[in-house]
Swiss-Prot record:
Coiled-coil segments on the chain, per record: none
CC cofactor: FAD
Species this protein is from: Caenorhabditis elegans
Function: Histone demethylase that demethylates di-methylated 'Lys-4' of histone H3, a specific tag for epigenetic transcriptional activation, thereby acting as a corepressor. Acts by oxidizing the substrate by FAD to generate the corresponding imine that is subsequently hydrolyzed. Plays a role in the mitotic development of the germline. May be involved in H3 demethylation in mitotic cells including gut and embryonic cells. Plays a role in sensitivity upon interstrand cross-link DNA damage, probably by positively regulating the expression of mlh-1.
Gene: amx-1
Protein known as: Lysine-specific histone demethylase 1B homolog
Tissue distribution of the protein: In hermaphrodites, expressed in gut cells, embryonic cells and sheath cells. Not expressed in sperm or pharyngeal neurons.
Superkingdom of source: Eukaryota
């Protein structure tokens, strides 16, 4: 085996003959001389480095002390920046009679899919894994002690370790590692691989362990040890934060083998291979701990015992990486978010004044995350209640959301996690949605083939439209009108094998086919809060290009307002404070807020977060901001659509809508197939909100909605008249049922000047990504924007609004933390 010093000796010999040139250079003397100079410089530098390492090894003690140890590492092998071994120990470790068998067994486990290995590096990996001592940190005095053992240590053992504090003296090398933030930048040692790591069981089935920085030979003792007083429970059904190869990308995941762009920006020294493995090892450990127990705050003290590796590497991880990486992931809202107690410390002693306009979920999310990060904020809410569009009604005996109540995809969804943290009940929805026409006929059960054919055709056409715009960026945008749907079918018939040819369209588009197609278009209008003629064919579903939350949809049966009430605890929320003007152009870099109530004094702040709805911005931005917002921001506000739906719920004396499919799935919602095209946005889907009232009595409630051309129905008719239309529709769908309404409730978001909408949509002619991204941009590090209208990947949802609040809180902290938002 060739040692490093032998390689260096050859470099020294080569450096003594720098003037040699190849025949191809002889014809060009200047070029030849330049090359000679460069070669001389490189050789001299190489010689200098070789001598430095040689001298260093001559002075160092061998860390292994095996067999016939030479005591010093002269002519030996460097294992890390501060650890080396002599040639004798290095050879004994894998060739000696006492260790050869162990090496063979270790090698079989360690190959881990490898067919070829670099022998010296592979042996270094073996030495790192089995021979280097552990360094345990005393939980009382924080001094490090060397522990020599052939057995691997567990997180519990490292957590419990206590030294004889008075007599323990750390070696100079330990001090050196403590002080050297670039200790890992060493080209000779093998990167340490984590043992008994908590992320192992999450990654082993999908990745080669060494590429994620784990030791495949030593993972039997991985375990969480600190539950923070809350019982451990399985969260895999709601969380999966590591990307699984060859599967669809979902929201809120990371790739365990690669750093994200913002991670590279924050930790530029670790941005490139192979050094990035050090960052990834700590990051993956932290995320795995959060994934397995997201019910208490992750702290440095909890993470330290989970970083298990032999040698000085463990000191480096603990002293230089855990804290900044945990801080970064916390600020970004990747971990340590939600509804539980945090240990709050002021950020670097700073006390900036932060105002948040609007106390809906995005505003409350911003304020709560800031508070977790050590910064207080004041929320100004125009209404006499907080919560925004998360508002429940209990008048019918069960919780019915006037606004948001549906979790759209429950895997990695922060709303699902909030429910779990708080203890709020939610019910996963099945996908059985029977379609019933106004003659009482259930297409899903009686005409299943036609129902499936229409569903396939509808989705194929939309897929063809999406594919066309993806393949041809210059293809002009058009409105996604119902009158164009048949045109789209003809236009894209050749793009999808699932579409019929134009010659078959007349036989395809029967009256029943078109009625079922209208149901799907009506459902699309509900999803966007507007008529399909207003939607961009190019970008109506622009968020589908991002990873969405996976899993089933769910209904928050306890009501979404409980989430808001919990998150708002301890925050400074000032109700009945409508804002009149925000002066952000002052020379002193302060932002001054004026209120509609003339008796309320104006207040100055360092930073202001605007979380009002898009509808409010559309109506007021021209007079609300002084000076006016940048033209690009104004255009984005004008370009994005403010969708609107209104909800109606009615209580009945019995559950008359029981329907089951062939698999016995009970109906949780059902669709109405209208005879008239214009009625498809009138009570398109009915949701079952039945449950127990506070007295434990069965309560039967259906909820539906109006949108598009029918959305103003709740304002032009009385609530009783709207409820009568609701029941009249149900009587047509269930002609033999006895339908006795006992009460009703409905929303009036469109008439609320402090809300004015439900959720956003991308109108014809707008660019979805550009518009959402412009809306989220901060201005001059003084004005910040949050809300579902500012998040391109998850608009229209509680989760999107909540995440936008975490995002802006993180942006504020990053701007305050230091001029350069790096964590090294």
């Amino acid at each position: 085996m060739t040692t490093e010093l032998e390689i260096d000796d050859r470099k020294e010999e080569e450096a003594q003959i720098p003037g040699e040139t190849s025949e191809s250079e002889e014809g060009d003397e200047p070029v030849k001389m330049n090359r000679v100079k460069r070669a001389c410089a490189m050789a001299a530098e190489s010689l200098k480095e070789a001598k430095r390492i040689k001298n260093m090894l001559m002075e160092e003690e061998c860390v292994l002390q095996l067999g016939n140890c030479k005591k010093t590492a002269s002519y030996g092998h460097r294992l890390s920046k501060t650890e080396a071994c002599c040639p004798s120990c290095f050879s004994v470790a894998f060739r000696g009679k006492d260790y050869e068998n162990e090496f063979t067994i270790w090698k079989q486990k360690a190959m881990d899919g490898q067919t070829h290995v670099r022998s010296e590096q592979f042996v270094k990996r073996y030495v790192n894994s089995c021979f280097l001592p552990y360094y345990a940190k005393c939980h009382q005095c924080s001094k490090y002690s060397k522990l020599i053992t052939s057995d691997s240590l567990s997180a519990q053992q490292l957590s419990d370790f206590k030294c004889d504090c008075a007599s323990t003296i750390e070696s100079p090398k330990i001090e050196r590692v403590r002080e050297d933030s670039e200790w890992c930048f060493n080209e000779f040692g093998h990167p340490p691989l984590l043992q008994n790591n908590i992320s192992y069981d999450l990654l082993v089935d999908h990745y080669v362990t060494r590429t994620t920085g784990m030791d495949a030979t030593c993972q039997e003792k991985a375990a969480l040890i600190d539950n923070g007083g809350i019982e451990f429970r399985d969260t895999r059904r709601i969380m999966n934060m590591f990307y699984v190869p060859f599967t669809d990308v979902i929201a809120n995941i990371v790739h365990p083998e690669f750093m994200e762009t913002d991670e590279k920006f924050a930790f530029p020294k670790f941005a490139d291979d192979p050094i990035s493995i050090y960052y990834l090892q700590v990051r993956n450990t932290i995320i795995a701990m959060w994934l397995k127990h997201p019910f208490v705050e992750l702290t440095v003290k909890m993470i330290e015992p989970q970083i298990i590796v032999r040698g000085h590497a463990r000191i480096f991880f603990i002293e230089h990486l855990i804290h900044p990486i945990l801080e970064f992931l916390t600020i970004k809202g990747v971990v340590n978010y939600g509804a539980f107690d945090f240990r709050i410390d002021p950020l670097n002693g700073m006390r900036p004044k932060i105002a948040i306009i609007g106390a809906g979920i995005s505003g409350i999310s911003t304020a709560r995350h800031l508070k977790h990060l050590g910064i207080d904020a004041v929320l100004f809410e125009a209404k006499d209640r907080f919560g925004g569009r998360m508002m429940d009604d209990q008048s019918l005996g069960v919780s019915v959301g006037k606004g948001a109540q549906i979790i759209v995809g429950n895997i990695n969804n922060p709303i699902t996690l909030l429910c779990e943290q708080i203890g709020i009940k939610y019910r996963n929805s099945n996908f059985f949605c029977p379609l019933i026409d106004e003659n009482g006929r259930c297409f899903t059960l009686e005409r299943k083939e036609l129902d499936d054919q229409v569903d396939l055709h509808y989705n194929n056409v939309l897929d063809a439209i999406r594919n066309k715009y993806q393949s041809d960026r210059n293809f002009p945008d058009v409105p996604l009108e119902v009158t164009n749907f048949r045109h789209f079918t003809e236009m894209f018939s050749k793009m999808s094998s699932g579409l019929l040819s134009a010659a078959d369209l007349d036989s395809l588009y029967t009256p029943e086919f078109e009625k079922l197609l209208d149901f799907h278009l009506g459902n699309l209008e509900f999803s966007c809060g507007t008529h399909v003629s207003n939607l961009s064919a190019k970008d109506y579903d622009h968020n589908e290009k991002f990873g969405n939350f996976a899993g089933e949809h769910a209904v928050i049966t306890d009501g979404a307002q409980r989430i808001i009430d919990f998150l708002a605890t301890g925050l400074d929320i000032r109700l009945n404070c409508p804002v009149k003007c925000i002066d952000w152009g002052r020379d002193d870099r302060k932002v001054k807020i004026f209120f509609e109530n003339a008796e309320q004094a104006a207040e100055e702040f360092d930073k202001v977060v605007i979380t009002t709805s898009l509808s409010v911005l559309k109506s007021n931005h021209s007079k609300m901001f002084v000076p006016p917002l940048p033209i690009e921001k104004q255009k984005a506000i004008d370009d994005l659509g403010a969708g609107l739906i209104e909800k109606i719920a009615v209580k009945f004396d019995r559950r008359f809508w029981d329907t089951v499919d062939a698999d016995g799935l009970r109906t949780e919602y059902f669709g109405k197939v209208s005879d008239c095209k214009t009625d498809r946005s009138l009570f398109n889907i009915f949701y079952d909100f039945s449950g127990k009232d506070p007295n434990g009595e069965d309560t039967f409630v259906l909820m539906s909605y109006v949108t598009a051309e029918h959305v103003n129905l709740v304002n032009v008719l009385t609530e009783s008249e709207v409820a009568d239309k609701f029941c009249a529709t149900l009587r047509k769908m269930f002609p033999s049922a006895v339908i006795n309404p006992l009460g009703h409730m409905m929303s009036h978001w469109g008439a609320d000047r402090f809300v004015g909408m439900s959720y956003t949509f991308v109108p014809f002619g707008s660019d979805g990504d550009a518009t959402y991204n412009q809306l989220k941009k901060s201005i001059d590090e003084k004005l910040y924007f949050a809300g579902e209208h500012t998040i391109a990947a998850e608009p229209q949802t509680m989760a999107g609004a909540y995440i936008s609040g975490l995002r802006e809180a993180g942006q504020i902290v990053m701007s305050l933390k230091r001029d350069s938002a790096t964590f090294e």
